Structures are given as structure tokens and as C-alpha cells.
Amino acid sequence: MKLHELKPAEGSRKNRKRVGRGPGGTDKTAGRGHKGQKSRSGAGKGSFFEGGRSSLISRLPKRGFNNVGTTYEVIQLGQLDVLEGDTFNREALELAGLVRRKNRPVKLLATGEVTRAVTVHVDAASAAAVKAVEAAGGKVILPNSQTEDAQKAE
């Protein structure tokens, strides 16, 4: 027996019923009954509709806030020290599994220590992280506008 010869067991698969396709079976109302809200296309109430009374969601108080700031993929200094190599860009960090979400910018933070000279290409970095990398003989390369901000912080 070969892979292309495999077939499902007899009677285990059933064709989908095509409704509303002529008078041969489920035609006219297509199993929806006559008239009424449930018979219309796009019918149905929202999942939180409670028959017209104030919904539970509107009765409970609001909590927290939505942060309008940028959400970063965060990398710690200590994580860089464990990795092989001395130059880290986004691709290298993704390969190492430190960056998971590709649509988020990468930020370097100063948690942990870096004991060798490394070059790091990131979208943002804390001032303490930049100092720590430079103290170890390395450098942090940021987009232009951010580089000036980090230098002012020193």
C-alpha cells in the first residue's frame, strides 16, 4: 500500500449539504423556517445581548487603561552574554529565540551583565544598557533619532 492509495473508511466521510439550491431537497427556506429574525441573512444577536436589559459588561466598572505607548520585544544584557558571536542584529536575535514577535520593535535593557565587547543593533535601548555595553568595550547602534537621545542621557 502506498500513501496515495489511502482512502477514508466507507461511510466515514459525508458530503456537505448544499441548501437553497433548487427544489430537489432543502430549497426555499433552507432549513430556517418561515420569516422572523432567525431566517434573515446576518441574523443573530451579539454574544453579549441579554434581551434588552443592561448587559453585565455595562454594569461592571471599567478597570485599568490601554497603553498608547509602543510595546517592545525586550532583551536583557545578560541574555546577550550567553550567546555566541559579537554582533547582534534583529535576525540574529530571532534565530536565537530572543525575539518572537516580528512586528514589534526590539529594546535592550540593562538587566544582567555583559562581559565582552558586543555590537548590538536594536530599535531602542535604556541609557543604563548603553552605558554597560560601552563600558565592556562594545557599542549599541540605534536608529538616528534614538542615538542622540541616548548620548544626551550620558
UniProtKB/Swiss-Prot annotation:
The protein's role, per its UniProt record:
Binds to the 23S rRNA.
Alphabetical keyword list: Ribonucleoprotein, Ribosomal protein, RNA-binding, rRNA-binding
A GO BP term here is: translation
Complex formation: Part of the 50S ribosomal subunit.
Q: Which family does this protein fall into?
A: Belongs to the universal ribosomal protein uL15 family.
Molecular function as annotated in GO:
rRNA binding; structural constituent of ribosome
Pfam families, per this entry? Ribosomal_L27A (PF00828)
Q: Gene that codes for this? A: rplO
Q: Which PROSITE patterns match?
A: RIBOSOMAL_L15
Assigned GO CC terms = cytosolic large ribosomal subunit
Which residue ranges does the record annotate as region Disordered?
1-52
What protein name is recorded for this chain? Large ribosomal subunit protein uL15
Q: Where is the composition biased (Basic and acidic residues)?
A: 1-13
Superkingdom of source:
Bacteria
What lineage does UniProt assign to this protein's organism?
A: Bacteria, Thermotogati, Deinococcota, Deinococci, Deinococcales
